[in-house]
Amino acid sequence: QGPPGTGKTFAAARVITALLAAGKSIGIASNSHKAVSNLLEECGKAAQQSGAQLVGIKVGGEGREPLVQSNPGLRYVANTSDARGAYKGGVVGGTAWLFSRSEWAGELDFLFIDEAGQVSLANAVAIARCARNLILLGDQMQLEQPIQGAHPGDAGLSVLQYALKDTQASRPDQPVFHPVVPPDYGLFLGETRRMHPSVCRFISESMYEGRLHSHSDCARQRIELASGKTRLITREQGIVFSPVEHEGNVQQSDEEVERVMAIYTELLGRSYTTKEGTTRPLTLHDVLFIAPYNAQVRALQAALPQGARVGSVDKFQGQEAPVCILSLCSSYGEYGARGLAFILDRNRINVAISRAQCLAVVVADPRIDGAGSLAEMRLINLFCKLCST
């Protein structure tokens, strides 16, 4: 389990290259070719650092990607039907379309499933038979797999959710998952090299039972307060709540767009100290602008300079920036069809806030903290903790 910034891909690549050096046959699978190639690329770097080269095949996806060009021992195979004949040992990377084929049954020593929190249980069952050992890589506290339709029982869970389901606390209609993998079941990477301790503290206590901490270098990060010019942002690092009351907004708030623009203008050009200790002025590229709804994303894109990094949480998983500005955009009581459960979803809040290396700013209607039901109270508890951090 790799929480944000803990180096899950880095660690997995070192495990894989060690197994390859021991003569094991390895499969790497995920939902997308991009995820598979990303892990393979890190494996190539790890192999080169140890004086070896990555050997094997990458099946499907783009044949001219830099991955194949930078790893001479890695061959590209376009068609899944040709893969088994082309594989002569080492590593093989592909999606479920490859590993679910009958000719791969029992052929590998280990199968690594990356981003396992977004791989469906059905797909995992279909591909797992190709290997004698299965290793899941991911974090069940980040974005869940997209689901269409209704699925009975546990069929709608991802393979990681299924593996980490708390059977004692779960109800038939409400599954509960271990926020941290039990020590007798797997490995938890507990040190982030991304977040300043004041950002990490909220993420750790709210999502990971207090088990996540920052590397000591992360404490160097700070954004200098400009003398006499500070109005909205009064902290050099951490989480800042910027309240904006508005009425009748469901998926878009012009009031919040205006506030986000003011915050961005105030931060632009301020002196930012990195975790390496170097100092430079903040630029547009140093800020992520996140909103739950596409309507608010479009409104922010229209207001911000061209080239601004604007999107929903889904777009930015795996990315980072010195500053993250989250606009929740819904007025009190106006939560739309998805409701408050979508706006304040724990996993989405986790991903949004943990993109920030130094400073996270939450722009929202403060009256959201008025709950009307027990279920809403659980969500509001997280919101209140976020606002008071």
Regions found by a protein language model. Give the residues of each.
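Post-Walker A helix-loop "phosphate-sensing" segment adjacent to the P-loop in P-loop NTPases
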Residues: L19-I26, Q48
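Conserved helix-turn-beta segment of the N-terminal RecA-like "Helicase ATP-binding" lobe
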Residues: A35-Q69, A299, A303-P305
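Conserved helicase motor core of SF1/SF2 NTP-dependent helicases
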Residues: A21-G23, N31-S37, E42, W97-I113, ...
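Hydrophobic positions on the alpha1 helix immediately C-terminal to the Walker A/P-loop
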Residues: A11, V15
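Inter-Walker segment of RecA-like/P-loop motor cores
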Residues: A52-L98
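Residues at the beta-strand->loop junction immediately N-terminal to the Walker
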Residues: Q1-P3, A29
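Conserved glycine(s) of the Walker
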Residues: G7
